Amino acid sequence: MADISISPDEIRDALKDFVSKYEPAKAATAEVGHVLDASDGIAHVEGLPGVMANELIRFADGTLGLAQNLDENEIGVVVLGEFEGIVEGMEVTRTGEVLSVPVGDGYLGRVVDPLGNPIDGLGEIATEGRRELELQAPGVMHRKSVHEPLQTGIKAIDAMIPVGRGQRQLIIGDRQTGKTAIAIDTIINQKANWESGDVTKQVRCIYVAVGQKGSTIAAVKGALEDAGAMEYTTIVAAPASDPAGFKYLAPYTGSAIGQHWMYGGKHVLIIFDDLSKQAEAYRAVSLLLRRPPGREAYPGDVFYLHSRLLERCAKLSDELGAGSMTGLPIIETKANDVSAYIPTNVISITDGQIFLQSDLFNANQRPAVDVGISVSRVGGDAQVKSIKKVSGTLKLELAQYRSLEAFAMFASDLDAASRRQLARGARLTELLKQPQYSPYPVEEQVVSIWAGINGKLDEVAVEDVLRFESELLDHLRRNTGILTTLRDTNVLDDETVEKLSSEVDAFKLEFQTGEGKPLAAVGREDFDAIAEEDVNQERIVKAKR
């Protein structure tokens, strides 16, 4: 057996060579965990003792996850993508990053998923940076009061429930009552502002679709393209087929994209369609993470889910660029019950609500806005002066018409004041009807409402009111500068009122009724203008007695 000799010099040289090649800067450590189980879009992972809340972690197959539950021995992770490839024992590593999304003007005209990846087949998106999804809302001292109008183009809303830039205005109602239609009309109505090229007027729009059918999202995109509104709109889509985690995150993605523009001094409109489905997705995620359920099985922090989202909508101070983000969250009710858990939560967070009634919708009153319980708490300060002047009594007259209409059902005959108010109310109600995808400029809304509340439609048959309005507006567009004056000044002064009154009277002489007769030749009960003291239900009831 040969002798083994060890040379000290060789050992010394080998150690020197190893030490000379060692580079401490290239050495790294990594926390590695392992999957315990994965199902229904949720994975439980052991290990990773230093992981942060809401940190992104990466599975061995490249799939990302969001750390939610930080328990003593395991982590509850929401899988962001397909979880079929995630199996027990798979390695999981930390990324050290929180969830963020790319942002920039490249997102205009595009359809993306909740991670900001394009899904419209139009190639990659040029980005300007990244923004965290869970970003803090602006503080109290960083805000400014809402004072600029955001026109929806819908007469019933702009006149009685006005929305200002930076406001959160809830749209609430049963399914199939026109909630999405109001939101889409509002986006379409921003086209004139966009084409003006004035950054102070332009409004960038974001439509967040949560839990909608894929065909519905495609229809919305098609409607926006047909109206030429897609060029200033981004769609964030989390359809019904997506995992619950994506539906939960989609509104935050849209908000992060919008905040980038808001902090850049621009104006943004964001629509969350709808937050009921986001709450249901968050409930599913929470139950799968084994969090304790509360009322209606929702987790205890479901209020915070929506409050931290909607508080990001704001009008920023001049020091921060005076940008704004206006939020139109949508909530779906069951059987018109606005006192349920999620509806009352969101009503308490927002600055007002537009309530849509299924009974009005089925009676062909569209948009089916119930002006009795709809309210805008801050939008009045942002309302244009001209429409504020003509709409001052509109809401009161309509409310009194509704109550008098119910009273008249049980009366055998009515006095003249009651008949006048019923006739006026029926025409005002008809005047507020509006076809979908047909928003009105504010100056045309002013003319229509002025004609209604000043008795110019009292001799027009109810079935002819919308045709009378359409032909009157065509006449004013062609023959006078009244609409131009209203658009440029936003003021309805005495001189403009006098011109408008004479033009409407002249048009009435030319108008043909549905029966082909001149309006002036149609015999109708002669109603004098309603005296202010007669517009009072108590007085009418006493007169009846």
From Swiss-Prot:
One Pfam family this sequence matches: ATP-synt_ab
Record-stated family: Belongs to the ATPase alpha/beta chains family.
Q: Which InterPro entries match?
A: ATP_synth_asu-like_sf, ATP_synth_asu_C, ATP_synth_asu_C_sf, ATP_synth_F1_a_nt-bd_dom, ATP_synth_F1_asu, ATPase_a/bsu_AS, ATPase_F1/V1/A1_a/bsu_N, ATPase_F1/V1/A1_a/bsu_N_sf
> PROSITE patterns attached here?
ATPASE_ALPHA_BETA
User: Which Gene3D superfamilies does this chain map to?
Assistant: 2.40.30.20, ATP synthase alpha/beta chain, C-terminal domain, P-loop containing nucleotide triphosphate hydrolases
Q: Where is this site: Required for activity?
A: 374
Q: Which cellular component terms (GO) are annotated to the entry?
A: plasma membrane; proton-transporting ATP synthase complex
> Membrane spanning segments where?
none
Identify the keywords attached in UniProt to this record, alphabetized: ATP synthesis, ATP-binding, Cell membrane, CF(1), Hydrogen ion transport, Ion transport, Membrane, Nucleotide-binding, Translocase, Transport
Keyword rRNA-binding listed: no
Q: How does it assemble?
A: F-type ATPases have 2 components, CF(1) - the catalytic core - and CF(0) - the membrane proton channel. CF(1) has five subunits: alpha(3), beta(3), gamma(1), delta(1), epsilon(1). CF(0) has three main subunits: a(1), b(2) and c(9-12). The alpha and beta chains form an alternating ring which encloses part of the gamma chain. CF(1) is attached to CF(0) by a central stalk formed by the gamma and epsilon chains, while a peripheral stalk is formed by the delta and b chains.
The record's EC number reads 7.1.2.2
Write down the chemical reaction(s) this protein catalyses: ATP + H2O + 4 H(+)(in) = ADP + phosphate + 5 H(+)(out)
* One Gene Ontology MF term: ADP binding
User: What protein name is recorded for this chain?
Assistant: ATP synthase subunit alpha
Q: What is its main location?
A: membrane
